[in-house]
Amino acid sequence: MYTKNIIKSFVAFTVATISLASCNTEVEPLEIVKPEAKSEQYYADLRAYKQRNDHEVFFGWFGGWNTKSANMRGSLRSVPDSVDIISIWSGTYDREDLEYVQKVKGTRVTFTIFAHKIPKAFMGGENKDQVTREGIERYAVSLVDTMKAYGYQGIDLDYEPGYQDPAGGPFTGPLVGPSYVYPDYRDNMEIFVKKLGEFIGPKSGTQYLLIIDGVPYDVKPELAEYFNYGVVQAYNSSSTSNLQSRFNRAASRGWKPEQYIFAETFEGPNAATGGVRHRLEDGTYVPSLRGMAEFLPIYNGKKATRKGGCGTYHMENDYYNWPNYKFTRQAIQIMQNHR
């Protein structure tokens, strides 16, 4: 089937064969085998496959976007064809690169924002320090307008209540708490998500994605249905049981297996090894990204047939492995067995 061949295909490489005569030093003509160009049918089938919601997806945060770099690492085009969703983490915007992966490969590209503060322009009061429903909703609409202006296909909310802000101290803001500073932060987040949900996500009736990562289960349980996916930062996960415990917390607050994506960090040394040492149910050890790809959560007393998928933070660092994106490709192939 086309779909199976698409997902299992690898980038073809130019092969040069040089034959030397055994009796003299004359070099025979160089024979170069050029990679076969992918057909229009291949790309049409690839796009159709990605439009369907019947499979686990590979999701990656892409950092250092730079199409002017010395190699392809900084380009979205370098990402394997079979990756479903790229979320831009950092870098330099390039419309041509963006539209190529969207229109040719059918890859959906979102952008990530920290969902904790509300810009002053959307705050009320004389000192612009009062949180209002109107301001929250205007902020949500402005994000959707920005998304459309730049040609993105969704928004990923980095949402980490209780965790440390890289700038120091816990993440703090009207949408994320902490509760002793913003006791109504979950109510504010509800207003924010529901307004976004009018334009993006499964409630909107559009193809635009609404994703939340970090601590998806902290939002009110009734908000889970507003998101296409929740991405848990299961960084350095040591075992299947660790993944299950993470999912249990989400399931208890309204999340379903097919919504949940488990992500490993490829920032630092993990990129070269596919993650950390991870114990499977049968006692064998594999790289943690592979463990996430193989994982199927227990839900309502039985093993799910599929989950949302798996992914990586700083996916672009897998480019340097051989072949390029080695661990990403392996994970996608494993997830093809889940239906």
Give the positions of each predicted feature.
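Bacterial N-terminal signal peptides that target proteins for export
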Residues: 2-11
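Secreted glycan hydrolases and related glycan-binding modules that recognize and/or cleave
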Residues: 23-339
